[in-house]
Every structure is written in structure tokens, then in C-alpha cells.
Design a protein with these regions (language model features):
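Short, glycine-biased loop/turn motifs at secondary-structure junctions and
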Residues: 1-146
């Protein structure tokens, strides 16, 4: 098992898999999820060194993973969090545990085995941008006119 809590010994239950993916999708599209994603993008863009670590929230040198970047931005004391406790991390960041697990999976496991911290930063930033819901200007204009 990994920090994400995902396991490789899937029992083939498509229904449970669909339920899990549905929870992840709802978490990412919800108000709290979108707020975290926007904060994450801002935190990533503000990083002086465009590098993301894996397997930890923050190192003693101050390097962070994707969720850790939000922790720095929001002033979360990450030394008190167990990076392998999805529920605890989710609570500290006001997101669903399914979202915490998915971000950790993307950060730690979705990239190539020999991925550099710089490449991880680039991949995660692109992924975060694809998950942020944008409202077309025309939709905002139509609402304010009507």
C-alpha cells in the first residue's frame, strides 16, 4: 500500500471502483475541492524553486509535495500531520479524504519511476489546471443581464 491508501490487489469489484471514482469526481468539483485546487495553483506558482517532493508533506529543509504547498500557503503546521493518514490530512485541509488520496496518488505514483522533482512540479501543475473548473465569460455576462 502507498501513502495514497490505494492498493494493487484490486478484487475486481467494478461497482466499488465506480463508487470510489464518483467520490473523487464529486470532491474535485465541489466548493471545498475547487478552493483547494485554486490555492494549490497559487502556491505552486509562488514557489521560488519549482520542485515537488514525493512521500512527505514537507521536509526539514522546507521542500513540499503538492498538498504541502497548500499547507505552506495556508500556514498549516504540517509537522503534526501523518502524511499517510488521508483522513487527518483531509481534515487539516478541509477536503474529502478521497480528494486527499487522489492528490497524493498523482503526486507520488502517477508519474514515471525516475521522475525529477522539477518534472513532478510541471506534471502536477498541468494536472491541477485541468481540474480547475472555469466559468466562461459569456455565462457570467448572461447571468448578470438576466
Amino acid at each position: 500500500m502507498s501513502r495514497s491508501g490505494y492498493v494493487e490487489d484490486w478484487d475486481g469489484d467494478d461497482w466499488q471502483y465506480a463508487l470510489c471514482r464518483g467520490r473523487v469526481a464529486r470532491a474535485f468539483k465541489g466548493k471545498r475541492g475547487q478552493a483547494l485546487l485554486k490555492d494549490m495553483l497559487a502556491a505552486l506558482d509562488a514557489m521560488p524553486e519549482k520542485r515537488l517532493i514525493a512521500h512527505e508533506l514537507e521536509t526539514s529543509e522546507g521542500a513540499v509535495c503538492a498538498i504541502g504547498s497548500v499547507g505552506k500557503l495556508r500556514g498549516v503546521d504540517m509537522s503534526k500531520l501523518d502524511p499517510e493518514d488521508a483522513e487527518g490530512v483531509a481534515g487539516a485541509f478541509d477536503i474529502a479524504p478521497s480528494m486527499a488520496r487522489e492528490i497524493v496518488y498523482e503526486n507520488d505514483e502517477a508519474g514515471p519511476h525516475n521522475e525529477t522533482p522539477e518534472d513532478r512540479y510541471t506534471r502536477i501543475r498541468k494536472w491541477i489546471m485541468s481540474e480547475i473548473i472555469t466559468v466562461p465569460v459569456s455565462a457570467v455576462t448572461e447571468r448578470s443581464d438576466g
